[in-house]
């Protein structure tokens, strides 16, 4: 069996100090890095929120359901992976949400499901 780990959106804007911070995000990033080192996956991939112009997804008065504060803007520090996440073992990054909201790596512009299937991950 071919095993893969999908690391989901471990970005600065979702960790402490970011525009949509989750408490403990930096610790999670470090724990994921350690997990990658101590586990045996055939493939490690990551997703990232990477907004170019997501339309109504951003709002100055977000409802936190359909609209959100500005976050993970393409090329910004907030869109970068958190420094506690060691990206050296990540084989492929799948960006999502460039021009519309996307909440799953399987919605990404790149074909995550196809990429995994091509490598025998089921």
Model-derived features: where do they sit?
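Alpha-helical scaffold elements lining the catalytic groove of polysaccharide deacetylases
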Residues: 97-119
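Active-site beta-loop-alpha substructure in enzyme catalytic cores
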Residues: 122
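Active-site acidic carboxylates
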Residues: 1-101
């Amino acid at each position: 069996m071919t095993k893969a780990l999908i690391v989901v959106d471990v970005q600065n804007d979702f960790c402490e100090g970011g525009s949509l911070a989750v408490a403990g995000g930096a610790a999670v990033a470090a724990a994921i890095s350690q997990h990658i080192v101590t586990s045996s996956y055939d493939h490690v991939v990551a997703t990232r929120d990477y907004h170019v112009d997501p339309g109504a997804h951003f709002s100055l008065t977000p409802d936190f359901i359909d609209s959100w504060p500005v976050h993970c803007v393409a090329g910004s520090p907030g869109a970068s992976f958190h420094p506690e996440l060691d990206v050296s073992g990540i084989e492929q990054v799948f960006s999502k949400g460039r021009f519309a909201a996307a909440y799953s790596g399987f919605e990404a512009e790149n074909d995550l499901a196809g990429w995994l299937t091509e490598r025998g991950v089921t």
